[in-house]
Amino acid sequence: MRIAWIFALLAGALALPGTTGAAERFVADPRLTVDCEAAILKGSGAFVQQKLKLLDKCTAGVFKCIQTTPPDDDAEDDPVDVCLEKMAERCAKTVEAIAAAEQAFTDAITKGCSALHPLEVLRADAVGYELIAQQCSDLGTDLTDLASVAQCIVQEHECAAERLFQAEHPRAGELLGLVDADLGPDSCLEDFGGGGFGVDDLVLGKQLDRCDAGVRKAGAGFTGKKQKSLAQCVSALYACDQLAFGNAECVAKAQKTCDKAFGTIAGEALKLEPSVDKSCAVVDFSQAVPDEGLAFTELVDECDTLGVSDIVTIDHYKTCLYRQHECIGDELMQFAAPRATELLMRVGR
Protein backbone atom coordinates (compact mmCIF):
# COMPACT_ATOMS: atom_id res chain seq x y z
CA MET A 1 0.00 0.00 0.00
CA ARG A 2 2.87 2.37 0.83
CA ILE A 3 4.41 1.81 -2.62
CA ALA A 4 1.10 2.49 -4.37
CA TRP A 5 0.62 5.63 -2.30
CA ILE A 6 4.10 6.90 -3.19
CA PHE A 7 3.53 6.26 -6.89
CA ALA A 8 0.22 8.10 -6.65
CA LEU A 9 1.87 11.15 -5.14
CA LEU A 10 4.69 11.11 -7.68
CA ALA A 11 2.16 10.98 -10.48
CA GLY A 12 0.31 13.91 -8.98
CA ALA A 13 3.49 15.88 -8.46
CA LEU A 14 4.41 15.43 -12.10
CA ALA A 15 0.94 16.60 -13.09
CA LEU A 16 1.09 19.91 -11.23
CA PRO A 17 0.81 22.75 -11.97
CA GLY A 18 -0.98 21.58 -15.12
CA THR A 19 -4.31 19.79 -15.12
CA THR A 20 -4.40 16.03 -14.74
CA GLY A 21 -6.85 14.15 -16.92
CA ALA A 22 -9.65 12.54 -14.93
CA ALA A 23 -9.06 9.19 -16.65
CA GLU A 24 -5.50 8.79 -15.35
CA ARG A 25 -6.66 7.30 -12.02
CA PHE A 26 -3.73 8.13 -9.76
CA VAL A 27 -5.66 8.41 -6.47
CA ALA A 28 -4.17 6.35 -3.63
CA ASP A 29 -7.48 5.65 -1.87
CA PRO A 30 -10.58 6.85 -3.75
CA ARG A 31 -12.75 6.33 -0.67
CA LEU A 32 -10.93 9.20 0.99
CA THR A 33 -11.61 11.58 -1.89
CA VAL A 34 -15.30 10.65 -1.75
CA ASP A 35 -15.34 11.30 2.00
CA CYS A 36 -13.62 14.65 1.47
CA GLU A 37 -16.03 15.80 -1.21
CA ALA A 38 -19.00 14.67 0.88
CA ALA A 39 -17.76 16.70 3.85
CA ILE A 40 -17.36 19.84 1.74
CA LEU A 41 -20.78 19.51 0.12
CA LYS A 42 -22.48 18.89 3.46
CA GLY A 43 -20.68 21.82 5.06
CA SER A 44 -21.49 24.08 2.12
CA GLY A 45 -25.25 23.71 2.37
CA ALA A 46 -25.28 23.86 6.15
CA PHE A 47 -23.12 26.98 6.32
CA VAL A 48 -25.08 28.99 3.76
CA GLN A 49 -28.40 28.25 5.45
CA GLN A 50 -26.98 29.01 8.88
CA LYS A 51 -25.50 32.31 7.79
CA LEU A 52 -28.72 33.37 6.07
CA LYS A 53 -30.66 32.59 9.25
CA LEU A 54 -28.21 34.50 11.42
CA LEU A 55 -28.26 37.55 9.16
CA ASP A 56 -32.05 37.34 9.19
CA LYS A 57 -32.14 37.12 12.99
CA CYS A 58 -30.33 40.43 13.29
CA THR A 59 -31.55 42.53 10.39
CA ALA A 60 -35.19 41.43 10.58
CA GLY A 61 -35.41 42.75 14.12
CA VAL A 62 -33.73 46.04 13.22
CA PHE A 63 -36.05 46.47 10.24
CA LYS A 64 -39.06 45.84 12.46
CA CYS A 65 -37.81 48.49 14.90
CA ILE A 66 -37.72 51.25 12.31
CA GLN A 67 -40.84 50.21 10.39
CA THR A 68 -43.35 49.09 13.03
CA THR A 69 -42.40 50.80 16.32
CA PRO A 70 -44.31 54.06 16.99
CA PRO A 71 -41.80 56.85 17.68
CA ASP A 72 -42.25 59.23 20.61
CA ASP A 73 -40.01 62.26 20.43
CA ASP A 74 -41.34 63.52 23.77
CA ALA A 75 -40.40 60.38 25.68
CA GLU A 76 -37.21 60.28 27.72
CA ASP A 77 -36.21 57.24 25.70
CA ASP A 78 -37.72 57.08 22.24
CA PRO A 79 -39.26 53.60 21.72
CA VAL A 80 -37.46 53.22 18.40
CA ASP A 81 -34.10 53.87 20.07
CA VAL A 82 -34.93 51.43 22.87
CA CYS A 83 -35.80 48.80 20.29
CA LEU A 84 -32.55 49.40 18.42
CA GLU A 85 -30.51 49.14 21.63
CA LYS A 86 -32.01 45.71 22.30
CA MET A 87 -31.28 44.66 18.75
CA ALA A 88 -27.68 45.86 19.07
CA GLU A 89 -27.16 43.27 21.80
CA ARG A 90 -28.74 40.54 19.69
CA CYS A 91 -26.75 41.51 16.61
CA ALA A 92 -23.46 41.50 18.53
CA LYS A 93 -24.16 37.87 19.41
CA THR A 94 -25.12 37.23 15.80
CA VAL A 95 -21.74 38.48 14.58
CA GLU A 96 -20.03 36.12 17.02
CA ALA A 97 -22.24 33.25 15.86
CA ILE A 98 -21.38 33.93 12.22
CA ALA A 99 -17.66 33.84 13.04
CA ALA A 100 -18.20 30.55 14.87
CA ALA A 101 -20.10 29.13 11.89
CA GLU A 102 -17.27 30.09 9.56
CA GLN A 103 -14.77 28.35 11.83
CA ALA A 104 -16.99 25.28 12.09
CA PHE A 105 -17.15 25.07 8.28
CA THR A 106 -13.37 25.32 8.08
CA ASP A 107 -13.02 22.60 10.72
CA ALA A 108 -15.47 20.34 8.86
CA ILE A 109 -13.44 20.65 5.65
CA THR A 110 -10.20 19.97 7.52
CA LYS A 111 -11.63 16.94 9.30
CA GLY A 112 -13.19 15.50 6.16
CA CYS A 113 -10.15 15.94 3.94
CA SER A 114 -7.09 15.71 6.21
CA ALA A 115 -6.56 12.01 5.41
CA LEU A 116 -5.75 12.99 1.83
CA HIS A 117 -2.37 14.21 0.70
CA PRO A 118 -2.64 17.89 -0.30
CA LEU A 119 -1.88 17.00 -3.91
CA GLU A 120 -4.97 14.81 -4.01
CA VAL A 121 -7.09 17.69 -2.78
CA LEU A 122 -5.71 19.83 -5.59
CA ARG A 123 -5.40 17.47 -8.55
CA ALA A 124 -8.05 17.42 -11.26
CA ASP A 125 -8.42 13.64 -11.17
CA ALA A 126 -9.09 13.73 -7.42
CA VAL A 127 -10.99 16.48 -5.57
CA GLY A 128 -9.97 18.99 -8.21
CA TYR A 129 -9.21 22.32 -6.57
CA GLU A 130 -6.48 23.15 -9.07
CA LEU A 131 -9.37 23.71 -11.48
CA ILE A 132 -10.40 26.87 -9.60
CA ALA A 133 -6.94 28.01 -8.56
CA GLN A 134 -7.36 31.28 -10.47
CA GLN A 135 -10.70 32.04 -8.82
CA CYS A 136 -9.15 31.46 -5.41
CA SER A 137 -6.19 33.64 -6.34
CA ASP A 138 -8.64 36.39 -7.30
CA LEU A 139 -10.01 36.10 -3.75
CA GLY A 140 -6.49 36.54 -2.38
CA THR A 141 -5.67 32.89 -1.65
CA ASP A 142 -3.05 30.86 -3.50
CA LEU A 143 -3.83 27.15 -3.31
CA THR A 144 -0.91 25.16 -1.91
CA ASP A 145 -2.40 22.85 0.71
CA LEU A 146 -5.61 21.85 2.49
CA ALA A 147 -5.59 24.94 4.71
CA SER A 148 -5.51 27.28 1.72
CA VAL A 149 -8.26 25.30 -0.01
CA ALA A 150 -10.46 25.55 3.09
CA GLN A 151 -9.74 29.28 3.34
CA CYS A 152 -10.80 29.82 -0.28
CA ILE A 153 -13.99 27.76 0.07
CA VAL A 154 -15.10 29.48 3.26
CA GLN A 155 -14.24 32.96 2.01
CA GLU A 156 -16.28 32.46 -1.15
CA HIS A 157 -19.21 31.02 0.81
CA GLU A 158 -19.13 33.95 3.25
CA CYS A 159 -19.45 36.41 0.39
CA ALA A 160 -21.97 34.36 -1.60
CA ALA A 161 -24.31 34.07 1.39
CA GLU A 162 -24.14 37.83 1.94
CA ARG A 163 -24.85 38.53 -1.73
CA LEU A 164 -27.87 36.24 -1.60
CA PHE A 165 -29.11 38.02 1.50
CA GLN A 166 -28.55 41.48 0.04
CA ALA A 167 -30.74 40.62 -2.96
CA GLU A 168 -33.48 39.48 -0.57
CA HIS A 169 -32.98 42.41 1.80
CA PRO A 170 -31.18 45.33 0.08
CA ARG A 171 -31.04 47.37 3.30
CA ALA A 172 -29.15 44.65 5.21
CA GLY A 173 -25.80 46.47 5.21
CA GLU A 174 -27.43 49.71 6.35
CA LEU A 175 -29.34 47.94 9.14
CA LEU A 176 -26.21 46.21 10.44
CA GLY A 177 -24.47 49.58 10.56
CA LEU A 178 -27.40 51.06 12.45
CA VAL A 179 -26.63 48.75 15.40
CA ASP A 180 -22.83 48.73 14.91
CA ALA A 181 -22.77 45.07 13.86
CA ASP A 182 -19.47 44.73 11.98
CA LEU A 183 -18.92 41.67 9.80
CA GLY A 184 -15.36 42.70 9.06
CA PRO A 185 -13.48 44.37 6.20
CA ASP A 186 -14.12 41.51 3.76
CA SER A 187 -17.90 41.65 4.07
CA CYS A 188 -19.77 41.71 0.76
CA LEU A 189 -22.82 43.45 2.24
CA GLU A 190 -23.06 47.00 0.98
CA ASP A 191 -24.51 49.91 2.93
CA PHE A 192 -26.42 51.93 0.33
CA GLY A 193 -26.77 54.85 2.72
CA GLY A 194 -30.49 54.74 3.43
CA GLY A 195 -30.16 56.78 6.63
CA GLY A 196 -31.73 54.24 8.97
CA PHE A 197 -35.28 55.56 8.62
CA GLY A 198 -38.56 53.74 8.12
CA VAL A 199 -41.74 54.95 6.46
CA ASP A 200 -44.03 57.35 8.33
CA ASP A 201 -47.12 55.15 7.98
CA LEU A 202 -46.94 52.29 10.53
CA VAL A 203 -49.59 50.29 8.67
CA LEU A 204 -47.44 50.44 5.55
CA GLY A 205 -44.41 49.65 7.70
CA LYS A 206 -46.03 46.42 8.87
CA GLN A 207 -46.90 45.52 5.29
CA LEU A 208 -43.31 46.14 4.22
CA ASP A 209 -42.09 44.01 7.11
CA ARG A 210 -44.33 41.14 6.02
CA CYS A 211 -43.19 41.47 2.41
CA ASP A 212 -39.55 41.57 3.44
CA ALA A 213 -39.91 38.47 5.62
CA GLY A 214 -41.64 36.58 2.82
CA VAL A 215 -38.94 37.43 0.30
CA ARG A 216 -36.19 36.28 2.66
CA LYS A 217 -37.99 33.02 3.39
CA ALA A 218 -38.61 32.33 -0.30
CA GLY A 219 -35.04 33.13 -1.29
CA ALA A 220 -33.44 31.05 1.44
CA GLY A 221 -35.82 28.18 0.73
CA PHE A 222 -34.93 28.09 -2.96
CA THR A 223 -31.22 28.28 -2.24
CA GLY A 224 -31.40 25.50 0.32
CA LYS A 225 -33.31 23.14 -1.98
CA LYS A 226 -31.02 23.90 -4.91
CA GLN A 227 -27.85 23.28 -2.91
CA LYS A 228 -29.19 20.06 -1.41
CA SER A 229 -30.43 18.71 -4.74
CA LEU A 230 -27.26 19.59 -6.65
CA ALA A 231 -25.17 18.02 -3.88
CA GLN A 232 -27.09 14.73 -4.18
CA CYS A 233 -26.53 14.66 -7.93
CA VAL A 234 -22.86 15.62 -7.88
CA SER A 235 -22.12 13.26 -4.98
CA ALA A 236 -23.56 10.34 -6.94
CA LEU A 237 -21.55 11.21 -10.04
CA TYR A 238 -18.37 11.76 -8.05
CA ALA A 239 -18.72 8.40 -6.31
CA CYS A 240 -18.99 6.73 -9.72
CA ASP A 241 -15.90 8.57 -10.94
CA GLN A 242 -13.81 7.62 -7.92
CA LEU A 243 -15.12 4.20 -6.89
CA ALA A 244 -16.50 2.73 -10.13
CA PHE A 245 -14.78 4.55 -12.96
CA GLY A 246 -16.17 3.53 -16.34
CA ASN A 247 -19.05 1.59 -14.77
CA ALA A 248 -22.09 2.33 -16.94
CA GLU A 249 -24.51 0.96 -14.34
CA CYS A 250 -23.23 3.37 -11.72
CA VAL A 251 -23.56 6.32 -14.09
CA ALA A 252 -27.08 5.25 -15.10
CA LYS A 253 -28.10 5.14 -11.45
CA ALA A 254 -26.50 8.54 -10.86
CA GLN A 255 -28.38 9.86 -13.90
CA LYS A 256 -31.68 9.00 -12.20
CA THR A 257 -30.54 10.78 -9.05
CA CYS A 258 -29.62 13.83 -11.11
CA ASP A 259 -32.86 13.84 -13.09
CA LYS A 260 -34.78 13.84 -9.81
CA ALA A 261 -32.54 16.56 -8.38
CA PHE A 262 -32.98 18.88 -11.35
CA GLY A 263 -36.71 18.22 -11.30
CA THR A 264 -36.78 19.35 -7.69
CA ILE A 265 -34.83 22.50 -8.52
CA ALA A 266 -37.20 23.34 -11.37
CA GLY A 267 -40.17 22.82 -9.08
CA GLU A 268 -38.71 25.07 -6.40
CA ALA A 269 -37.99 27.74 -9.01
CA LEU A 270 -41.68 27.76 -9.93
CA LYS A 271 -42.59 28.36 -6.27
CA LEU A 272 -40.27 31.33 -5.74
CA GLU A 273 -42.19 34.06 -7.56
CA PRO A 274 -45.65 33.09 -6.22
CA SER A 275 -44.21 33.09 -2.70
CA VAL A 276 -42.99 36.66 -3.18
CA ASP A 277 -46.37 37.66 -4.62
CA LYS A 278 -48.21 36.18 -1.64
CA SER A 279 -46.13 38.14 0.86
CA CYS A 280 -45.99 41.41 -1.04
CA ALA A 281 -49.41 41.57 -2.71
CA VAL A 282 -50.78 44.18 -0.29
CA VAL A 283 -47.85 46.55 -0.87
CA ASP A 284 -47.96 49.19 -3.59
CA PHE A 285 -44.62 48.55 -5.28
CA SER A 286 -43.96 52.27 -5.68
CA GLN A 287 -43.98 52.49 -1.88
CA ALA A 288 -41.62 49.54 -1.50
CA VAL A 289 -38.77 50.71 -3.69
CA PRO A 290 -37.63 53.93 -1.92
CA ASP A 291 -34.69 53.86 0.51
CA GLU A 292 -36.94 54.17 3.56
CA GLY A 293 -38.98 51.19 2.32
CA LEU A 294 -37.36 48.02 0.95
CA ALA A 295 -34.86 49.86 -1.28
CA PHE A 296 -35.26 47.48 -4.22
CA THR A 297 -33.95 50.16 -6.59
CA GLU A 298 -30.50 49.78 -5.03
CA LEU A 299 -30.27 46.47 -6.89
CA VAL A 300 -30.60 48.05 -10.34
CA ASP A 301 -26.93 47.68 -11.29
CA GLU A 302 -26.74 44.01 -10.28
CA CYS A 303 -30.06 43.22 -11.91
CA ASP A 304 -28.87 44.84 -15.13
CA THR A 305 -26.05 42.28 -15.33
CA LEU A 306 -28.72 39.57 -15.06
CA GLY A 307 -30.77 40.89 -17.96
CA VAL A 308 -33.25 42.95 -15.92
CA SER A 309 -32.70 46.53 -17.04
CA ASP A 310 -34.79 48.28 -14.39
CA ILE A 311 -36.88 47.59 -11.29
CA VAL A 312 -40.18 49.39 -11.67
CA THR A 313 -42.54 46.49 -10.98
CA ILE A 314 -42.58 43.52 -8.63
CA ASP A 315 -42.17 41.26 -11.67
CA HIS A 316 -38.83 42.91 -12.46
CA TYR A 317 -37.66 42.30 -8.91
CA LYS A 318 -38.83 38.68 -8.83
CA THR A 319 -37.03 37.90 -12.08
CA CYS A 320 -33.83 39.47 -10.81
CA LEU A 321 -34.08 37.68 -7.47
CA TYR A 322 -34.53 34.29 -9.13
CA ARG A 323 -31.70 34.77 -11.63
CA GLN A 324 -29.30 36.00 -8.96
CA HIS A 325 -30.07 33.07 -6.66
CA GLU A 326 -29.76 30.63 -9.55
CA CYS A 327 -26.33 31.99 -10.54
CA ILE A 328 -24.97 32.10 -7.01
CA GLY A 329 -26.21 28.57 -6.40
CA ASP A 330 -24.12 27.44 -9.37
CA GLU A 331 -21.14 29.42 -8.09
CA LEU A 332 -21.40 27.79 -4.66
CA MET A 333 -21.35 24.37 -6.30
CA GLN A 334 -18.24 25.28 -8.29
CA PHE A 335 -16.36 26.05 -5.08
CA ALA A 336 -17.77 23.09 -3.15
CA ALA A 337 -17.14 20.63 -6.00
CA PRO A 338 -14.73 22.01 -8.62
CA ARG A 339 -15.34 19.02 -10.88
CA ALA A 340 -19.11 19.51 -10.91
CA THR A 341 -19.26 20.90 -14.46
CA GLU A 342 -17.26 18.00 -15.85
CA LEU A 343 -19.31 15.43 -13.95
CA LEU A 344 -22.67 16.94 -14.87
CA MET A 345 -21.74 16.86 -18.56
CA ARG A 346 -21.57 13.07 -18.31
CA VAL A 347 -25.32 12.98 -17.73
CA GLY A 348 -26.20 15.78 -20.13
CA ARG A 349 -26.49 18.54 -17.54
What would you call each of these model-derived segments?
Residues 5-15:
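Bacterial N-terminal signal peptides
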